[in-house]
């Protein structure tokens, strides 16, 4: 989307992006610092939120774990017009994120205008980093990095705006080792990572309804980094060789696309239904051009096999033992999928290794890494 379109169709680029050039500093308020007390307080600045958003779910889950570990969190929305007041926002969180954000002592506010001193202030998206850069009413600044956000845009202004935030001098808390290494090596940031897990009360093996060959594809045509077109071309090649195969699409409504093979269009789907779909499939395709998503572990825990691309962005967690890895080429994806469908014994080994990996993960253990990084940084 162009900057002009982003600017509400008015071409008012300067006004729309005024927060990028705003260099007014928010100073330390000593009286607020002295009144906080001994318990460590964290300010989290988050972008606008919609029901079930994956990135926000990970943030809220981390906040809940940290709250139980003794770090008190306040959540502040940056540039949101969705809510009428703080209570409206809190009711929204309770309705849509109660499983992830399950500590009632966590505070939530609709605007950074009310933000007061905290020991640490944490940016959670590139837009929020611009506010945190000028917020000096804090002792330490962190950046909760879940993906390489410049990659969300064509090379241009917004790519640059996003990339520049990695040079603001914050300490990075990254989702996985690929981002940790990238923040350290490419931008000189001090960084620590946390790993992934999944909700095993939802994502678990289920008995299949039949033995029909079936594939799942995570379909997000509105999200370019999920490479929908690449996946669709690959599935069409598979269909030519396996005309009886069935495909399940989940993630977005694909009814407006010409799809010549038999398929089921789940559209946007609740986690329970997604887990059931995984369990019905031999192989689940997840295109991941930037950072790995949580979905591979969810697929594995559901008793299916994940297929995704080679690359450091994925292989910090996945490997050839637990995953079908392919080159980002329709022909190679087709060949790999057909090969493992033709060799069910080898597919079963990957399924077993994937389940073992999924069962070895734990969200609390990963949150402990975040806790230790924050506490050690504050005491340094």
Where are these regions (language model features)?
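A charged, aromatic-enriched C-terminal amphipathic alpha-helix characteristic of glycosyltransferases
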Residues: 342-376
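Acidic donor-binding loop of glycosyltransferase active sites
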Residues: 279-291, 304
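Short acidic/histidine- and often glycine-rich active-site loop of Leloir-type glycosyltransferases
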Residues: 298, 310-325
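Conserved acidic donor-binding segment of nucleotide-sugar-dependent glycosyltransferases
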Residues: 320-331, 339-344
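Acidic anion/phosphate-binding donor-loop and adjacent secondary structure
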Residues: 21-31, 150-156, 192-212
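Membrane-proximal helix-turn-helix segments that form the acceptor-binding/catalytic region
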Residues: 108-117, 155-172
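Short hydrophobic beta-strand element within catalytic cores of glycosyltransferases
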Residues: 305-309
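Conserved catalytic-core segment of nucleotide-activated headgroup transferases in glycan assembly
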Residues: 58, 77, 182-189, 193-264, ...
